[in-house]
From Swiss-Prot:
Its EC number is 2.6.1.87. Pfam families: DegT_DnrJ_EryC1. This is UDP-4-amino-4-deoxy-L-arabinose--oxoglutarate aminotransferase. GO terms for molecular function: pyridoxal phosphate binding; UDP-4-amino-4-deoxy-L-arabinose aminotransferase. Gene3D superfamilies: Aspartate Aminotransferase, domain 1, Type I PLP-dependent aspartate aminotransferase-like (Major domain). Belongs to the DegT/DnrJ/EryC1 family. ArnB subfamily. It comes from Proteus mirabilis (strain HI4320).
């Protein structure tokens, strides 16, 4: 019997293990020098002004929206076709998530759809760089600038992504994820990246109890005695155990993303005649991070629905993922917004399937997945 091929597996090697061991032996395992190293390395690699490590991208989104003063009576524009944490945070802050539809084939919002959704109550716009591809930032920034509304880029899928001549995270405000399946992982973690000095200071304050100065003194490895709480804050800091893994992973990003690109190219070659629909890549110049490789399983074309297709792959010892079920189709939001209709999000939500993709996969693994897909579809077409 074949071994189980998971949808994703972190590419953890001896360097990451040694980095964790070094932190454990250092006597300082919470937020400290490895956090500083991670933030510094990210800024140097991508030309960012500020990078603030947090315990998750969700935590990062929370403190960014808090720092921007988002609250009751405000509206925040976001796609529904995203991980539900963004919509949850907006809702928990007492604001209204204004969910807009996406392009059918890139899964990203357009500047036109965002512009139509702007009202006098709009206080932020959160586009998602999807699956490793960048949004059309020029168009989105033009809309946001014209309206005087902050743009917060959800870059959880986009570490190592370029839009035209800039890295994602080089300009503006972006939030990155180091979750277990991401291109750079430390199990759980994230970064808030911004070129706004005031926003960076507030995020640093809010993510660690509201302390008004850097709480870690690198000379004595402890909390500065003069640190004072200047506003209520949260406990969203990242431990050095996690940060040490991310530092090594970040140094390996080019190598790992190159392997992802190789695997995706092979998938695309072998599936080009399949009734499965692959995502389109943006027409504007970009560098794709290939975070996910997704297909759409349309029953009309494939003779099988997505859920059955995923189950049959599981029976063949192949894992898959769903990224994502549109937020407005989830029970809570379905009941809260019963008349909301977003046709492209709904169709993709019902047909999307993420195939196995991670740096330690081999070309033989891709061929195995493709052969299994062909066997399944041949039974239904």
């Amino acid at each position: 019997m074949s071994h189980f091929l998971p949808f994703s597996r972190p590419a953890i090697g001896d360097e990451e293990i040694k980095a964790v061991e070094s932190v454990l032996r250092s006597g300082w395992i919470t937020t400290g020098p490895q956090n500083h190293q991670l933030e510094q390395d990210f800024c140097e690699k991508f030309g960012s002004k500020h990078a603030i490590a947090v315990c998750s991208a969700t935590a990062g989104m929370h403190v960014v929206l808090m720092a921007m003063g988002i609250g009751p009576g405000d509206e925040v524009i976001t796609p529904s076709q995203t991980w539900v944490s963004t919509i949850n945070i907006i809702t928990l802050l007492g604001a209204e998530p204004v969910m807009v539809d996406i392009d059918r084939d890139t899964l990203m919002v357009s500047a036109e759809s965002v512009k139509k959704a702007i009202t006098p109550r709009t206080k932020a716009i959160i586009p998602v760089h999807y699956a490793g591809a960048p949004c059309d930032l020029d168009a989105l920034r033009a809309v946001a600038d014209e309206a005087g509304i902050p743009l917060i880029e959800d870059a959880a899928h986009a570490i190592g992504t370029r839009y035209k001549d800039e890295w994602i995270g080089e300009k503006g405000t972006s939030i990155f994820s180091f979750h277990a399946i991401k291109n750079v992982t430390c199990a759980e973690g994230g970064l808030v990246v911004t070129d706004d000095d005031e926003l960076a200071n507030r995020v640093r304050c809010l993510k660690f109890h509201g302390l008004g100065v850097d709480a870690f003194d690198r000379q004595v490895q402890g909390r500065k005695p003069q640190a004072e709480v200047v506003e209520p804050g949260y406990k969203y800091n990242l431990s050095d155990i996690h940060a040490a893994i991310a530092v090594v992973q970040l140094s390996r990003l080019e190598e790992m993303n190159a392997k992802r690109a190789e695997l995706v190219a092979l998938y695309r070659e072998k599936l080009q005649d399949s009734p499965l629909e692959m995502l389109s890549v943006p027409e504007y110049p970009h560098l794709h991070a290939n975070h996910l490789f997704m297909v759409r399983v349309d029953k009309n074309a494939c003779g099988i629905d997505r859920d059955t297709f995923m189950e049959k792959l599981k029976q063949k010892e192949i894992g898959t993922g769903l990224h994502f079920r549109a937020a407005h189709t989830q029970k809570y939001y379905r009941e809260r917004y019963p008349s909301l209709s977003l046709p492209q999000s709904e169709w993709n939500s019902a047909t999307l399937c993420s195939l196995p993709l991670f740096p330690d996969m081999s070309n033989k693994d891709v061929i195995r997945v493709v052969d299994a897909i062909n066997e399944i579809l041949s039974e239904h077409i």
